């Protein structure tokens, strides 16, 4: 029967590594419970707690909280647990009831973002989602180094979750999804599934004050959002020293061009610089700037030199732009082809951009030279509720058709072009 189990389980992936190749402190087992109880510790073998004298000498220097087994003991227990798991899957009467495996990782958490019940042939265990503390370190590696200090210091704020030890021992570290079902080898990237912002974002947000810090976001914060945060964070606290420094820099820029007559205006600009910096992007600009550009584009004040904040303000403020769909006639003189098609008319400030179309024969690009609105020819409205007229083909004169009301009565309508095509 053992040979049969080995043949069937050849398809599974079993890496050649010791069962505890990472830091995974296990709680001490209850005396009244055995291996089949609620503990992960095995009798005589398996992962022993770090406080036991047997595992103290076998623990590695890099992994002080984990014991190691010899090759013979590991192979014997591993093969026996594999066979028992196979017998439990085939039929309940073929062998004894399966116990928990001697390896430290015997299950796969399907979705690391939500609470999920781990399905495993060796048993069922629920891993609760760990709520992230704002005071705790940002990554699971930092939490593993500090031990269970954050959990033991705040027992009243958060109760014990399911799957956590009840005797106050340090909680086992939560790992992302493993490579295989029975594989103790976890992914190398421990920060693959982090709740809240990453370590880089946590270091950036630690410098901000408590009043500016909001609730942690539900999704992961990417590197681009971190860069945006670094750009926005230093601009909030603006002091008079920063305004004076900016005024001095602006004076050094404008002094060669405008001459020595600028100190009064530079002082005014130095006072106005912190106000413009403290103004949020959603607030409307001042009245002086509003009357400068009527078409929505920011017009520079006459005689004013370049400002260090002008490119940032230009990027933050959206320009006046809209897209309007039109119908136009396209005509290729080389191929003597004329067609009607919809195009997009982009208006940005005072610039009108036509999106070109290509001739189907010579592949040349053309702009529409006749513009008409998308209106119904019957009710003269852009959005109409007129009944759609289906095409009716006369058997005697197939080139005369009743088409849509949009092109009815036009000089070059659908029926005219259809008739012209039949005549040719």
Curated annotation (Swiss-Prot):
GO cellular component terms given for this protein: cytoplasm; cytoplasmic ribonucleoprotein granule; intracellular membraneless organelle
A GO biological-process term: translation
Zinc finger (3CxxC-type): 326-409
InterPro entries membership: Zar1, ZAR1/RTP1-5-like_Znf-3CxxC
Subcellular localization: Cytoplasm, Cytoplasmic ribonucleoprotein granule; Cytoplasm
MF annotations from Gene Ontology: molecular condensate scaffold activity; mRNA 3'-UTR binding; RNA sequestering activity; zinc ion binding
PTM summary: Ubiquitinated and degradaded by the proteasome during oocyte meiotic maturation, leading to MARDO (mitochondria-associated ribonucleoprotein domain) membraneless compartment dissolution.
Any Pfam family hit: Zn_ribbon_3CxxC
Organism domain of life: Eukaryota
Domain text: Disordered region at the N-terminus undergoes liquid-liquid phase separation (LLPS) for the formation of MARDO (mitochondria-associated ribonucleoprotein domain), a membraneless compartment that stores maternal mRNAs in oocytes. The 3CxxC-type mediates binding to the 3'-UTR of mRNAs.
Protein family membership: Belongs to the ZAR1 family.
Protein name (database record): Zygote arrest protein 1
Species of the source: Homo sapiens
Gene of this entry: ZAR1
């Amino acid at each position: 029967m053992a040979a049969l189990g080995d043949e069937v389980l050849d398809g599974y992936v079993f890496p050649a590594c010791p069962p505890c190749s990472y830091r995974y402190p296990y709680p001490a087992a209850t005396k009244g419970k055995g291996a089949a109880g609620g503990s992960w510790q095995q009798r005589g073998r398996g992962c022993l707690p770090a406080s036991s004298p047997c595992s103290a000498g076998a623990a590695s220097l890099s992994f002080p909280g984990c014991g190691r087994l010899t090759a013979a003991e590991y192979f014997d227990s591993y093969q026996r647990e594999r066979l028992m798991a196979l017998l439990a899957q085939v039929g309940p009467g073929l062998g004894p009831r399966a116990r928990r495996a001697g390896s430290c990782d015997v299950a796969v958490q399907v979705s690391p973002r939500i609470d999920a019940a781990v399905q495993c042939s060796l048993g069922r265990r629920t891993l609760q989602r760990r709520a992230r503390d704002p005071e705790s370190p940002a990554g699971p590696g930092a939490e593993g180094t500090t031990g269970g200090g954050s959990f033991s210091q705040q027992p009243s704020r958060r109760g014990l979750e399911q799957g956590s030890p009840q005797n106050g021992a340090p909680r086992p570290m939560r790992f992302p999804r493993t490579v295989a079902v029975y594989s103790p080898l976890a992914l190398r990237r421990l920060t693959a599934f982090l709740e809240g912002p990453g370590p880089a974002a946590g270091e950036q947000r630690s410098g901000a004050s408590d009043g500016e810090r909001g609730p942690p976001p539900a999704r992961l914060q990417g590197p681009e959002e971190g860069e945006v945060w670094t750009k926005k964070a230093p601009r909030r606290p603006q002091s008079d020293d920063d305004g004076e420094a900016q005024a001095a820099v602006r004076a050094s820029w404008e002094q060669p061009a405008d001459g020595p007559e600028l100190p009064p205006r530079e002082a005014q600009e130095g006072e106005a610089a912190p106000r413009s910096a403290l103004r949020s992007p959603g607030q409307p600009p001042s009245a002086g700037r509003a009357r400068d550009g009527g078409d929505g584009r920011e017009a520079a004040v006459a005689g004013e030199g370049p400002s260090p904040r002008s490119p940032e303000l230009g990027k933050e403020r959206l320009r006046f732009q809209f897209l309007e769909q039109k119908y136009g006639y396209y005509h290729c003189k080389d191929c003597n082809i004329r067609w009607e098609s919809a195009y997009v008319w982009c208006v940005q400030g005072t610039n009108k951009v036509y999106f070109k179309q290509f001739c189907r024969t010579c592949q040349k690009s053309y702009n529409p030279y006749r513009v008409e609105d998308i209106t119904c020819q019957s009710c003269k409205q852009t959005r109409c509720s007129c009944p759609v007229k289906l095409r009716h083909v006369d058997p005697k004169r197939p080139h005369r058709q009743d088409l849509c009301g949009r092109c009815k009565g036009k000089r070059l309508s659908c029926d005219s072009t259809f008739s012209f095509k039949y005549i040719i």
